[in-house]
Amino acid sequence: QKKDKKDKF
């Protein structure tokens, strides 16, 4: 799992 600005999981 990557921490992206778009993905907030």
Swiss-Prot record:
Q: Any idea which UniProt keywords this protein has?
A: Pyrrolidone carboxylic acid, Secreted
Disulfide-bonded cysteines:
none
Annotated source species: Phoneutria nigriventer (Brazilian armed spider)
Q: Which domain of life is it from?
A: Eukaryota
What is the name listed in the Swiss-Prot or TrEMBL entry for this protein?
Tachykinin-like peptide-IV
Mark the residues carrying the PTM Pyrrolidone carboxylic acid.
Q1
On whether Secreted is a keyword of this UniProt record, the answer is yes
Q: Which GO terms describe its cellular component?
A: extracellular region
Family to which this protein belongs: Belongs to the tachykinin family.
